[in-house]
Amino acid sequence: MAPPNTKESQLPGEQPTALCKRCNEVQATLQIRSESVCQKCFLQYIKTKAVKRMETYKGKRSTKVPQKLLLPLSFGPSSSCLLHMLDGYLGIQHERMNRVSYELFVVHIDLYLDDADREASAARLQKYKDQYPRHSYSSYGLHEALQLEGIDWQSLGISDLPTQDTKASSFDLQKIVSSLSSATSRADIVSTLLNRLLVDVAKRNDCESILFGDTTTRLAEKTLTETAKGRGFSLPWQVSDGPSPYGIGFLYPLRDILKKEIMTFSTSFSPLPELVVHQAPPSHISASSKSTTIDDLMAQYFESVEENFPSIVANVAVEFAGFLSQRALMASMVGVEIKIQIHGHQEKTLIQILFYAMDAQDLSTDESARP
């Protein structure tokens, strides 16, 4: 006897069960953009996006010598999911071919920690080591960035630095950051020091590139944030895959995945729920608050937009980054206004491009539009 169909088996007044839009076999419980899908199809979609992006990084290099790549691990959803996905992919590679195309150097940077916090951080890092043992791991304190060479401290508004003869401490870092006048300035200096320390660690450990866990949503946030701060010239390496001015590659393997999709992944698939540290969801942020940063406002904006309009988020990150990556770099070198041509339209300046991208065709699932 044939199994009863959904309509016949449902109770009076009960809504019909929706099937997965991809396999049409299993009940849909999760979302990909605006599609309702089952867990299996969701997992396949997310993993495929990250792995396909990683495959584009290999280029023409010899596959016999694995690339060494640094993966910054914050214990948050994005970096944890990236590590989980790449660990699984490398395991399959090794099983099939007895070799891997790249090896991961996983680095955790502690921000402001006392001894007790540092012990808790080390214990959590050990959990990741136990779960994903094929990789090498290391941790550093952000205060170590205070003794890096080649940073223009004066341009950052910092003068009271520890001497080279004195070992920097987390207290020194807190003192410097708290001396800055605005919340945005404080967030900026932490972000700058974090990136410069990661670059230094990557170079000292012979890594070719850094794998950042930035999602489509995060890249869209950075695009508007850096533009608002007058730093549009930095977008080619802040949102696009490729070389950075620091002599090492910046890569974004999760660039085709929305933040809300990563959040779902991190809470739905073992062992991530036991490993990931989730930040408390932000309450409504007031633009007039002294503790509010530009980054906070952009994050709040895109968090509300991606829920119902994922194409807007994708268009900002995908279309803008793709067109900007080459021309903005050349423009910034000669100090001219950034202008580019889009779809045969008249030239548009940096800000105009952003709003054009928001109103463009839906590129959120268009593979041909990916940079």
UniProtKB/Swiss-Prot annotation:
Pathway entry: tRNA modification; 5-methoxycarbonylmethyl-2-thiouridine-tRNA biosynthesis
Keyword tRNA processing applies: yes
SUPFAM superfamilies: Adenine nucleotide alpha hydrolases-like (SSF52402)
One GO term describing the cellular component: cytosol
UniProt keyword Repeat, yes or no: no
GO molecular-function terms, A-Z: nucleotidyltransferase activity; sulfurtransferase activity; tRNA binding
Annotated GO biological process: protein urmylation; tRNA thio-modification; tRNA wobble position uridine thiolation; tRNA wobble uridine modification
Main location group: cytoplasm
Subcellular location as annotated: Cytoplasm
Keywords: Cytoplasm, tRNA processing
InterPro entries: CTU2, Rossmann-like_a/b/a_fold
Family that this chain belongs to: Belongs to the CTU2/NCS2 family.
Free-text function comment from the UniProt entry: Plays a central role in 2-thiolation of mcm(5)S(2)U at tRNA wobble positions of tRNA(Lys), tRNA(Glu) and tRNA(Gln). May act by forming a heterodimer with ncs6 that ligates sulfur from thiocarboxylated urm1 onto the uridine of tRNAs at wobble position. Prior mcm(5) tRNA modification by the elongator complex is required for 2-thiolation. May also be involved in protein urmylation.
Name under which the protein is recorded: Cytoplasmic tRNA 2-thiolation protein 2
Origin organism lineage: Eukaryota, Fungi, Dikarya, Ascomycota, Pezizomycotina
